[in-house]
């Protein structure tokens, strides 16, 4: 009988990752059948999708509340199918709110479970470790320090590296990126990434734009380039930009990035420095070896929730940006909340743009980080999944 694997991915990044893992599984176990919830990358590998990936996609708390009936219906159907015909192993890829609950019920019923992409318990809500311990037979993690964390907690774990490290080149080509974007080869370029969510753009864009205006005042030749994930976010950003004008500001979307490289990556690669919202984009910037200033601002009500939670639980890491977390150091500046004033952002970013010796040092540190994260992620993940399935056979 062929190997059957249940699988749920809830976001495009998870779909891309899962598609590569399925390819790794097929190379090691011909005839393997994977089914559950997934997207086009998984479908291209023969994945049987019971529900489309967007069935799990929500945008903020209001949307999540509205989607509760459909989410519960999807959850119930997937759980029923997997309990009726238990797979050899179930693999949940990210989407922890959905997958950890499902994994717990499947594991109680005797199905081994693997969870890929550990929740950021090291940054927020560490108490989730108890839920993970009960739900997950084996964790697959992206970062080296996570492996030690889960081992300490008695949870079987495999460090498989970060897939971005295998996609982003070890040696970026600034000239090629500028050619793709139509930017002068000798220009000084600042990439501005205020986030991909409406709430992030609303809170960060005014500060980033005011900082950029000050930087252009200092150096009128400076080119500020803003990549946007889609036309909707671009329209939101440009509406704010009309209130905070920056001479020569350029906003680009995917069609202008030319080629398969995400437009944000092209802009990072083309830049001399990056002013970036905390999130995955900070890791992408580090893999492109660019100096950066990391910033983030929460809404007032979210700040109150975070302040309350920080008083209830153990203290967290002193760093917010992923590059600093991974390097265990303030390798690049972080300006958060009230510290994220336009003046402070401008000063820190000016330093990133003009300090050539500092740029060389950070390039060396980010190159070492890139090498540390570079593994054959699909192969390692596939091997671990098959070992869990074999152990349960």
Swiss-Prot record:
Q: In which pathway does it act?
A: Bacterial outer membrane biogenesis; LPS lipid A biosynthesis
Under Enzyme Commission nomenclature, its number is 2.4.1.182
Sorted alphabetically, which Pfam families does this protein's record hold?
A: LpxB
Tell me what reaction this enzyme catalyses: a lipid X + a UDP-2-N,3-O-bis[(3R)-3-hydroxyacyl]-alpha-D-glucosamine = a lipid A disaccharide + UDP + H(+)
Q: Does the keyword Glycosyltransferase apply?
A: yes
Q: Does the keyword Lipid biosynthesis apply?
A: yes
* Recorded superkingdom: Bacteria
Which Gene Ontology CC terms are recorded? membrane
One GO biological process term is: lipid A biosynthetic process
Q: Which family does it belong to?
A: Belongs to the LpxB family.
Q: What does this protein do?
A: Condensation of UDP-2,3-diacylglucosamine and 2,3-diacylglucosamine-1-phosphate to form lipid A disaccharide, a precursor of lipid A, a phosphorylated glycolipid that anchors the lipopolysaccharide to the outer membrane of the cell.
The protein depicted here goes by the name Lipid-A-disaccharide synthase
Q: What is the native source organism of this protein?
A: Bordetella pertussis (strain Tohama I / ATCC BAA-589 / NCTC 13251)
């Amino acid at each position: 009988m062929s190997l059957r694997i249940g699988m749920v991915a809830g976001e495009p990044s998870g779909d891309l990752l899962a598609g590569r893992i399925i390819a790794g599984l097929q190379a090691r176990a011909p005839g393997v059948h994977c089914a559950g919830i997934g997207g086009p990358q998984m479908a291209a590998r023969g994945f049987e999708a019971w529900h489309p990936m967007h069935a799990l996609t929500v945008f903020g708390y209001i949307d999540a509340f509205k989607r509760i009936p459909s989410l519960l219906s999807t959850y119930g159907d997937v759980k029923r199918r997997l309990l009726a015909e238990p797979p050899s192993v179930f693999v949940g890829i990210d989407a922890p709110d959905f997958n950890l609950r499902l994994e717990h019920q499947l594991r109680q019923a005797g199905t081994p479970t693997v969870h890929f992409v550990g929740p950021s318990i090291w940054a927020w809500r560490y108490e989730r470790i108890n839920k993970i311990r009960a739900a997950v037979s084996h964790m697959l993690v992206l970062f080296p320090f996570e492996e030690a964390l889960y081992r300490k907690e008695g949870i079987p774990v495999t460090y498989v590296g970060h897939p971005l490290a295998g996609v982003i080149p070890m040696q970026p080509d600034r000239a090629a990126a500028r050619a793709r974007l139509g930017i002068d080869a000798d220009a000084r370029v600042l990439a501005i990434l205020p986030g991909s969510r409406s709430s992030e753009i609303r809170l960060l864009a005014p500060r980033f734009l005011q900082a950029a205006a000050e930087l252009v005042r200092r150096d009128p030749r400076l080119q500020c380039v803003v990549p946007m994930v889609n036309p909707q976010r671009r329209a939101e950003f440009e509406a704010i930009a009309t209130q905070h004008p920056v001479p020569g500001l350029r906003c680009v979307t995917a069609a202008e990035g030319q080629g398969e490289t995400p437009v944000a990556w092209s802009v990072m690669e083309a830049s001399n420095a990056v002013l970036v919202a905390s999130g995955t984009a900070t890791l992408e910037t580090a893999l492109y070896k660019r100096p950066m200033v990391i910033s983030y601002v929460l809404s007032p009500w979210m700040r109150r929730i975070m302040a309350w939670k920080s008083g209830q639980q153990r203290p967290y890491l002193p760093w917010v940006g992923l590059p600093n977390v991974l390097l265990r150091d303030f390798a690049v500046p972080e300006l958060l909340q009230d510290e994220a004033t336009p003046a402070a952002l401008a000063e820190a970013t000016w330093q990133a743009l003009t300090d050539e010796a500092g740029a060389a040092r950070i390039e060396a540190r980010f190159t070492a980080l890139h090498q540390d994260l570079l593994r054959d992620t699909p192969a390692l993940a596939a091997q671990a999944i098959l070992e869990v399935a074999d152990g349960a056979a």
